[in-house]
């Protein structure tokens, strides 16, 4: 069978999502950043071994770093050196975006969270967002709105 006749499996471009960020924060401005990874990390991400539940972005010395993202190594991929699953990874942004992020982080109540990790062509990209923390009553309001939208859909579907 030639290579032209082989069918490729459609792969989802999303590697990992931080659903907790959508629950705990109001996400305002979003940015797309490249991620500087090692070879074993790319292999592990291709095997869907990434996790972003408590990841955030730290700005130090004019550079952005992804903190708290876990990439579990494959046992066969990294036998000759020590791997660190939770190491800080550098985010690749242009200067204008870095300045906006640093300025927003200095405002009271704002933080920078990583919302998702995905493939764009053959590169790993990270979507980051400027976020403001939600209070308990904000979370309840969001839940009520979500339930109301579900009820509206049910009524429209029944008709």
From Swiss-Prot:
Keyword annotations: Cytoplasm, RNA-binding
PROSITE patterns named among the record's database cross-references: SSRP
The UniProt record lists the keyword tRNA-binding: no
Residues making up the signal peptide according to the UniProt record: none
Protein name: SsrA-binding protein
Sequence similarity: Belongs to the SmpB family.
PANTHER family: SSRA-BINDING PROTEIN (PTHR30308:SF2), TMRNA-BINDING COMPONENT OF TRANS-TRANSLATION TAGGING COMPLEX (PTHR30308)
SUPFAM superfamilies noted in UniProt: Small protein B (SmpB)
Protein species of origin: Saccharophagus degradans (strain 2-40 / ATCC 43961 / DSM 17024)
Location relative to the cell: Cytoplasm
Function, in words: Required for rescue of stalled ribosomes mediated by trans-translation. Binds to transfer-messenger RNA (tmRNA), required for stable association of tmRNA with ribosomes. tmRNA and SmpB together mimic tRNA shape, replacing the anticodon stem-loop with SmpB. tmRNA is encoded by the ssrA gene; the 2 termini fold to resemble tRNA(Ala) and it encodes a 'tag peptide', a short internal open reading frame. During trans-translation Ala-aminoacylated tmRNA acts like a tRNA, entering the A-site of stalled ribosomes, displacing the stalled mRNA.
Domain of life according to the entry: Bacteria
Any one of the GO CC terms: cytosol
Gene Ontology terms: biological process: trans-translation
An MF annotation (GO) of this entry: RNA binding
């Amino acid at each position: 069978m030639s290579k032209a006749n082989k069918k490729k499996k459609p792969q989802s471009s999303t590697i990992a999502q931080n659903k907790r960020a959508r629950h705990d924060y109001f996400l305002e401005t979003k940015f797309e950043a490249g991620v500087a990874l090692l070879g074993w990390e790319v292999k592990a991400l291709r095997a869907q071994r990434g996790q972003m539940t408590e990841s955030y972005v730290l700005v130090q010395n004019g550079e952005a770093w992804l903190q708290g993202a876990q990439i579990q190594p494959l046992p066969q991929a990294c036998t000759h050196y020590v791997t660190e699953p939770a190491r800080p990874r550098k985010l690749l942004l242009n200067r204008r975006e870095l300045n906006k992020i640093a300025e927003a982080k200095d405002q009271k109540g704002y933080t920078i969270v990583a919302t998702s990790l995905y493939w764009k062509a053959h590169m790993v990209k990270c979507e980051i967002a400027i976020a403001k923390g939600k209070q308990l009553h904000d979370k309840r309001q969001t839940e009520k709105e979500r339930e109301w939208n579900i009820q509206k859909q049910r009524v429209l579907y029944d008709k």
